[in-house]
Amino acid sequence: MTKGILGTKIGMTQIWKGDRAVPVTVVLAGPCPVVQRKTKLTDGYEAVQLGFAPKSEKRVNRPELGHFKKAGVAPMRFLREFRDFAPEGDTVNVDIFAEGEKIDATGTSKGKGTQGVMKRWNFAGGPASHGSKKWHRRPGSIGQRKTPGRVYKGKRMAGHMGMERVTVQNLEVVEVRADENLILVKGAIPGANGGLVMLRQAAKGGK
């Protein structure tokens, strides 16, 4: 059985463990009410739907409001499913994780707007000198000749960068502060401060 929780990225800091400083990301995680339980009998798979961050009923449409009332919980800003997770009780708190445990963190990366191929895809660019003129940051050739006579799908080119779902795997839980609903994770987590973060048990079972 896997486990997971929703939270908000607070920011990064460092704490001392013994005689060394450890960089950590602070996440305000939970409490997350259980909004729906899905079973193989009714839905074809096992999952639980968790909510996070209450919001006003005025901001909820009628179908959503009925969904929340059926579960007996206040309207939530975020709803996410966790497969093969069967929590005990009606609320999931940050204490489902323990210090030293490995987790996967999923967030939405920071938006960078429209960027060229050097920043977006780490292209080398053109020559800086020796006759090069207005070619320093260009991508170069993007195709072949009359055959195939088109640019292949997926060709790495300039365009919108960031604002994508990113998962960082096998991050270590440095500290859990259950009384404050805080979890301190070693290293960086994708996204801006205040963004939604999904924390799940490590899929690859990191050591």
Curated annotation (Swiss-Prot):
Part of the 50S ribosomal subunit. Forms a cluster with proteins L14 and L19. One of the primary rRNA binding proteins, it binds directly near the 3'-end of the 23S rRNA, where it nucleates assembly of the 50S subunit. GO terms for molecular function: rRNA binding; structural constituent of ribosome. Disulfide bonds: none annotated. The keyword Translocase does not apply. This is Large ribosomal subunit protein uL3. It comes from Deinococcus geothermalis (strain DSM 11300 / CIP 105573 / AG-3a). InterPro entries: Ribosomal_uL3, Ribosomal_uL3_bac/org-type, Ribosomal_uL3_CS, Transl_B-barrel_sf. Keywords: Ribonucleoprotein, Ribosomal protein, RNA-binding, rRNA-binding. The keyword RNA-binding applies. Gene3D superfamilies: 3.30.160.810, Translation factors.
